[in-house]
């Protein structure tokens, strides 16, 4: 149910800012996609070959259509990459990022066979939580919004109407009782803290109130004269520098699950009623242990709700807080969008099945908890949308993939093709070779490539084979590395950077050489056991793997097989079809394929040096903190789209004295940003990591100046 709001959304045009113009197949694809959507087609498919610029095409399409857009990606890392690309292409519009805010999540579960109860355990990433709030804030206040999300967007997200109703509007000249205003901030889950000013808190100094919204990087200052708001301003939370003077601002709740006293009391009464009914049912079935367990757990939760307004696992009572009937769908991010929003599903061959699978996986775990007295039946209604419910809530959809699935193709009136690359690069030549003598042949091909300073990817079916092959190559003196699931994320980044930099020549892997790897130096992809049918050698998997050689002018794919399977035939035919079309286009237009030159980010080494320097500057306390913190979820930007980030804010305001920032607070910020810098690099977010590195360097310089001046 979409919320009814008095807020008038600001209207600014979507505008792509890029030094490049659409080229290759892009102009035709953009025009055709826009035409089909404007003609009212509900489902449109863009079949875009690897490296043809599908993200840029999507941005130009949004510019033509001028509609709020939700872009769904299959995982957090791809969502972060997309958000970065859209932010670069549409710098003047709100590009938001909405994924699960858990760095670590162990769901509550019960295993009847061993009578094992597993408690819920999780770690929340505060920056990702801020970005989630920023997304809903943008959707409610403006129309030029693109939200890049994972399947997290189909999970329950409080009650949008309650979220809007409890928002606090502030306008210069309006009258507000000061104490009543403070009570309203507390009601929407902001905490008063006059000592440590952090996100989600407010502080009071005489007639001045400062509040730090959970979705912003900048704080808000409210200056009052009696009961009248005299001035509103946006300021930097650390330095106190005024960034802008405002006439009107909105403060949204600090939680999407905000509930007023009346709603809370009604929910508690409903929970008590459901508990009584369920206990009677269990006792009739002779399940006395389950009844006792449920009584103890639920009465404790009810008492916690009455005393502090929340409890552990409060999301399991969301049906009662939302006032929904059993079985009805939850409110999700989709309900925050205006009615005419556009949905874009990236890598649709992966994402569409993922959306459909979410509900059953969640429900089977919760049914066990309900059956054994750990949860009330209403816990089953704290769930993601079912596929049918998801379809009811979306309007027009554009599916993007190099290998669209049967579902997308069956719903559209033929796919819009984007086969020609702006660089003129063509799909690699596919060569099928017999398995007899395959390793000797592969060694010969590797030697040919290394002589030309090119790189090779080798994909095997099993971990054992990959290990044995790597050992054999080492014996032959080939510079080789092995990429597998046991390699941690940061080391994986280093391996890919080292391959591109030429520190070694061959990378052996299993299923890690498909979507998301951008390696222009790779001229040969070798697929061993290509004729062994299964998930890793399906038509879709083979096309995706072939795409890894599509960024090199002399790219080739060698499939080692004794027979041509239907999957191989499909992949080879599709690759040849695209290749013929690309070669014909280049010939007709006099295009000379240009090698893709991408800067090799040596950010990993820089981060390691920055880490050592930070440790020397901050001492042993930093080392302990560093060891205690895990890698965070990928985040697409250091600062909010609307504010330009903390660094930009400082750049816009006048310089302040070094003494304006306490040394302890500065050291804490250096520590926090260094952790985020490492996390960004671990998720291949090199631009963010570089920006964070610059920020850390600036702060360390400031701290050293303070120490030299005897101020720290």
Curated annotation (Swiss-Prot):
Forms a heterotetramer with UvrA during the search for lesions. Interacts with UvrC in an incision complex. Residues 438-604 form the Helicase C-terminal domain. SUPFAM superfamilies: C-terminal UvrC-binding domain of UvrB, P-loop containing nucleoside triphosphate hydrolases. Belongs to the UvrB family. It comes from Streptomyces coelicolor (strain ATCC BAA-471 / A3(2) / M145). A motif (Beta-hairpin) lies at residues 101-124. This is UvrABC system protein B. ATP binds at residues 48-55. Gene3D superfamilies: P-loop containing nucleotide triphosphate hydrolases (3.40.50.300), UVR domain (4.10.860.10). The keyword Nucleotide-binding applies. InterPro entries: Helicase/UvrB_N, Helicase_ATP-bd, Helicase_C-like, P-loop_NTPase, UVR_dom, UVR_dom_sf, UvrB, UvrB_inter.
């Amino acid at each position: 149910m979409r919320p009814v709001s008095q807020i008038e959304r600001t209207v600014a045009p979507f505008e792509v800012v890029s030094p490049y113009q659409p080229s290759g197949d892009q102009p035709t694809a953009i025009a055709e996609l826009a035409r089909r959507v404007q003609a009212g087609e509900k489902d449109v498919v863009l079949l875009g070959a690897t490296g043809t610029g599908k993200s840029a095409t999507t941005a130009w399409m949004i510019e033509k259509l001028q509609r709020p857009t939700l872009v769904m990606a299959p995982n957090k890392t791809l969502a972060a990459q997309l958000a970065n690309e859209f932010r670069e292409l549409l710098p003047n519009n709100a590009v938001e990022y909405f994924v699960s805010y858990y760095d670590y999540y162990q769901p509550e579960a019960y295993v009847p066979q061993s009578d094992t109860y597993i408690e819920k355990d999780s770690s929340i990433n505060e920056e990702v939580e801020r970005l989630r709030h920023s997304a809903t804030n943008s959707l409610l206040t403006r129309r030029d919004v693109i939200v890049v999300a994972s399947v997290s967007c189909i999970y329950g997200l409080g009650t949008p109407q309650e979220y809007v109703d409890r928002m606090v509007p502030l306008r210069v000249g309006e009258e507000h009782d000061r104490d009543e205003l403070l009570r309203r901030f507390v009601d929407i889950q902001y905490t008063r803290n006059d000592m440590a000013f952090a996100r989600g808190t407010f502080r009071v100094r005489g007639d001045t109130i400062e509040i730090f919204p959970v979705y912003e990087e900048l704080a808000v200052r409210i200056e009052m004269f009696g009961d009248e708001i005299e001035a509103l301003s946006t300021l930097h939370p650390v330095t106190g520098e005024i960034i802008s003077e405002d006439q009107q601002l909105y403060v949204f709740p600090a939680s999407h699950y905000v509930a007023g006293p009346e709603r809370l009391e009604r929910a508690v009464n409903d929970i008590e009623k459901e508990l009584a009914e369920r206990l009677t049912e269990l006792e009739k079935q002779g399940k006395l242990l389950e009844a006792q367990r449920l009584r103890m757990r639920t009465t404790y939760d009810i008492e916690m709700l009455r005393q502090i307004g929340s409890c552990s696992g409060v999301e399991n009572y969301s049906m009662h807080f939302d006032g929904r009937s059993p079985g009805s769908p939850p409110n999700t991010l989709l309900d925050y969008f205006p009615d005419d929003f556009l949905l874009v599903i990236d890598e649709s061959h992966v994402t569409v099945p993922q959306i459909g699978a979410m509900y059953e996986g969640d429900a089977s775990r919760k049914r066990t908890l309900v059956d054994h007295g750990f949860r009330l039946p209403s816990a089953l209604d704290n769930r993601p949308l079912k596929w049918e419910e998801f379809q009811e809530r979306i309007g027009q959809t554009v599916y993007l993939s190099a290998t669209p699935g049967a579902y997308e193709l069956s719903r559209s009136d033929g796919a819009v093709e984007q086969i020609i690359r702006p660089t003129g690069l063509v799909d690699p030549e596919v060569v099928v070779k017999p398995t007899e003598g395959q390793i000797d042949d592969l060694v010969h091909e590797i030697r040919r490539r290394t002589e030309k300073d090119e790189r090779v990817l080798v994909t095997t079916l099993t971990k054992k084979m990959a290990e044995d092959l790597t050992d054999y190559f080492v014996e032959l003196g080939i510079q080789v590395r092995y990429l597998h699931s046991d390699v941690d994320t940061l080391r994986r980044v280093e391996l890919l950077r080292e391959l591109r930099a030429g520190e070694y020549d061959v990378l052996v892997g299993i299923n890690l050489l498909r979507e998301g790897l951008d390696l222009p130096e790779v001229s040969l992809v070798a697929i061993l056991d290509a004729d062994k049918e299964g998930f890793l050698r399906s038509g879709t998997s083979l096309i995706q793997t072939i795409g890894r050689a599509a960024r090199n002018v002399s790219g080739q794919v060698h499939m080692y097989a004794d027979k041509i399977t239907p999957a191989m035939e499909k992949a080879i035919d599709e690759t040849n079809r695209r290749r013929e079309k690309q070669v014909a286009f280049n010939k007709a237009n006099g295009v000379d394929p240009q090698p893709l030159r991408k800067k090799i980010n040596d950010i990993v080494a820089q981060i390691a040096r920055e880490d050592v320097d930070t440790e020397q500057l901050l001492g042993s306390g930093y080392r302990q903190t560093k060891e205690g913190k895990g890698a965070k979820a990928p985040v697409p930007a250091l600062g909010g789209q609307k504010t330009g980030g903390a660094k930009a804010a400082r750049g816009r305001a006048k310089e302040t004295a070094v003494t304006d920032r306490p040394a302890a607070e500065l050291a804490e910020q250096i520590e926090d940003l260094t952790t985020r810098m490492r996390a960004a690099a671990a998720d291949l977010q090199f631009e963010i990591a570089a920006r964070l590195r610059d920020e850390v360097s600036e702060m360390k310089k400031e701290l050293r100046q303070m120490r030299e001046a005897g101020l720290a």
